[in-house]
Amino acid sequence: MEIVRNGIKCCLAWPPNYVLIFGEFYHFKCRRSVITYDWSNLVGADEFLCAVGYAHPNYREPDPDFDPFVMYCSSNKMLALDTVTDELYIIAESPAHFCSIGLRNFPPFARIELDIELDRLWYGETKCSGEEFVLLQKNIPALKNFVNRQCGQKIRIDAFQNFDLSFCSSNDIHYITGSGILEKILRRKYVVIGTCARCQVEPNCRAVILLGPNFHIYVYCDNKINKVARSIREFIRRGFEELLYKERYALNWHDDSLIYVSESEAENLNRMLNGESPILRKKPRHMYPRCDRYVKIKVLLFGILYTILLLMVPWMFFFRLLKNMPSILFAVHSSEISNPLVQSVTKFLHPIIIPNGDTELKYIVPVTESRLINGLQASAAGRFGIKGLRLCSDGVIWNRLIDYEYEMFKYPSTFTRADKFLLQLRDLKFMEDFDPKWQCITKLAAVGFYSGASLFNLGAKPGIGYWCRYLCEYLSMLFFKLDGKLKELSKESKQKLGGFSCAFWSESFKTEMQNKTESFFRRDFFDRFQLYLLEHFLLFCGCEECRYNFFRFKNVGTMKKNPGSVKLHFFPALGKIDLPIFPHLSEKYSNLSMFVAKDLCLSFIEGQIEHSRFPISVTVDMGQDKRNLLNILSNIVFLLFIIQTLNSVLFTELKMYYDVYLDELKNLESSMECEMKLGSKGCMNNIVYFNMLKQVKDIVRNPGTSSNFIFNCLEVIKMSFEIPYYKNYDETNFMESFYLHHLYIQRQPAKHTDLVAANNLAPGFFIVNAKEKSFIDVLERSIVNIEAEYLSNTKNINGAMALFFSGLKYFGNFGNGNFQTSPEKDVRAVGYKLGGLDKIQNDLCYFANVETLACVGVDASDGNE
């Protein structure tokens, strides 16, 4: 590559007002040579570099000892030289890529200090110039105080990606993937500064960001600590680009401070965060200062001995017990002591005076306005607008909806299905001051949100409709392969079929196979393929098992033979379903019925796809061409069975939700008419209310069908939320019970899995500002009718899904390797807590609960103080 005309300038895509001037080093009177950098570890042994030119601001000439010099590599990559440090960086994958991004991937630009205007011009919403957070990088005590003050606040990370950093400290985190790992990290002198993630991610799924002992920025992810940037400023501007850059080109940081955690050390937090752990006590274990069980045993033995010695002085022993009891203090900053929201919590506490010189570590729970506002996102009332429920019922509904909002799992069987959800809906408990006639609004909202997310959102992986589309595309690919396998049949195989194959695979039948909408969900279409599979086994094999299966199915029409019928664990309301007949199935598929009952084999199918294998393989001694054809037919029958069973579950659930929707819709109409007749304040003369009633009556007369009722349901929900009583309902009592419970002031018992899960997840919503777009607005943009055209992916096509399976047409094998499944991934990796052991600070006001006031060992002030 040779530069034809030196001195030509062209504008760069980034930074703004930068240009690239072409020329060799010597054209700019620089003594460097491109050949020198051919020995860089970024350049392969058989590669070479060519000069391109200097990048510099347009208002001045290039500075050879300051501005970056751009080079081209023979492997088509673009590189840039930092002329200050003499380091070489890969900045683009190709010249075209370089033209589109400019010098975005040039790390030294992210480290320089810019004035406020230029910083905004270069990096948009990210702020670094003069920011306190950036300036405190090497002042660890001040940085910790800053993080504690800003806990719950977010800042934008990465000017070119949608990341955010939420401030929090090690006192706000209970576990990172497992017990003891956080302590191990802190012992290595790392400092927790927050958690980071893309937007619309649950707080418990965020990655922990750390400041290392060398003042570099690290991230804890996938059971290891990785360096992401050399400074806070660079991390704010570039995010994780440096880490991705190192991994992409297999480069090392040469950093001995990296930590790797073994899988045995990393526990699965999902069991705790999903509510499967033992029931929480009145105070969780992390609120006890003495966490060493051996210390507790020694203290207990000492107490027994002390009891014997002080048997004549019982009051001294009682005082000793009180002094050793764990205490919780609630800290409020002096600037927020008069905040109404903070006062709604502190009115249940007693202010206390801390003696001067008290250096003992105490368990302190910060109470701030931002935390209390954030915390309401951990309730169905605050996040979804579903009002009137008691705390226990609110936690159940919130936990169910939050899983769907964040798409926490990938298989529908992991979520609660309609039968169990409607039982929970029936058992909802409402606040005593909530008018019973408006309970229908709460139930309508719960049914509408849950059914919309679980059934009508065909683009989300947790939905049943998504998997119908997924498997329909897979089945279409199998039909394509079937045509190829028929052409591969040998002359001897065709003679064995005796002309049957020609009659079977007629042009009309091929057209029917290609019509996904009309064929894939029909029972007779499945029965035909089941019969064709058995006929082909009879003609190719002809053993006793094949003859028995064929004539039994042909004459009796039953499929209870081999392997039998099963009942779906996740949806028993469907009853027992008969399994297809697969002659000569491999021995490793003996547990196939167990996987069908567990999750309809979805994890098994996806696991096989990930390893480029087809789900079903048969073991029969015959030619390869015949075995391939039988394998394809077996997989077609298997997928048709799964698709039609999913379809049955889908429409059974639709019917269940639709019946509840109709009942609650009629209840809403009656309640609104009653309110209108009684002439309650704000209704009789309210033309808006009258119009809403008219619209509800119209919807009652035309409620829609079970396959499209969600559209009317969401319209009714939005109108119902505007009804004066519901809109203006005073939630003070609920909010008080919510804060008292989650701040461990007045804990309510949690014996239900959903309540335990809600209790474990809620601290993360207090600490991380998780307020997102309105759930109902997001739902309205993603729902579609439940029709065969949508379920078969022939209407509103998921292009990525179709492209994926079209690429698999020429790949795949049968029966090689072990039986593979794709289990649910453990996406929740951070467990939060609302306080930690800390020292008393002078600028904070402290409060104590009435129950533990005597345990603090300090004086209680009167109300005036």
Curated annotation (Swiss-Prot):
Protein family per UniProt: Belongs to the herpesviridae U4 family.
Name of the protein in its database record: Protein U5
Source organism: Human herpesvirus 7 (strain JI)
Gene name for this UniProt entry: U5
